From Swiss-Prot:
Annotated GO MF terms: deaminase activity
NCBIfam families: Rid family detoxifying hydrolase (TIGR00004)
Record-level GO cellular component terms: cytosol
Organism: Leuconostoc mesenteroides subsp. cremoris
Protein name, UniProt field: RutC family protein in leuC 5'region
InterPro entries: RidA, RidA_CS, RutC-like_sf, YjgF/YER057c/UK114
UniProt-listed Pfam families: Ribonuc_L-PSP
Family: Belongs to the RutC family.
Disulphide-bridged cysteine pairs: none
Length: 130
């Protein structure tokens, strides 16, 4: 078993005592990402849509740093501050994976939580495997 910290300046730095991602053998665990632009350390926008797009950019950048791709994602966990945004995020999520078959999407869970760090609208955690 080999465990390696994955870190990139093209995604926001951790807000607490955790790594952006951990690569353990062939599995990449990406910590929950919120819609912070790594260049400004501020939210990419106030809306769920703006934050969702930034989250997917951040995830892409971490995947790239670990030499993984979107096709390697096997599980996504979505945390909403308001589950009413579920359909909106589904549309953005579907564009991100760019697939026509629901069977090709990663496994996923989506829940509403009481609050997210920095009052984010959405947080997404990813597991990817090669």
């Amino acid at each position: 078993m080999s465990k390696k910290v994955v870190s990139t300046t093209t995604a926001p730095k951790a807000l607490g005592p955790y790594s952006q991602a951990i690569l353990n053998d062939n599995t990449l665990y990406i910590s929950g990402q919120i819609g912070i632009d790594p260049e400004t350390d501020e939210f990419a926008g106030a809306t769920t849509a703006e934050q969702a797009h930034q989250i997917f950019d951040n995830i892409d950048n971490i995947l790239h740093e670990a030499e993984f791709s979107r096709n390697d994602i096997v599980k996504a966990a979505l945390f909403f501050d308001d589950i009413a945004d579920f359909a909106l995020v589904n549309d953005i999520y579907a564009q991100y994976f760019d697939t026509t078959s629901v069977e090709e999407f990663p496994a996923r869970s989506a829940v509403q939580v009481a609050a997210l760090p920095k009052n984010a609208k959405l947080e997404i955690e990813i597991t990817a495997m090669k």
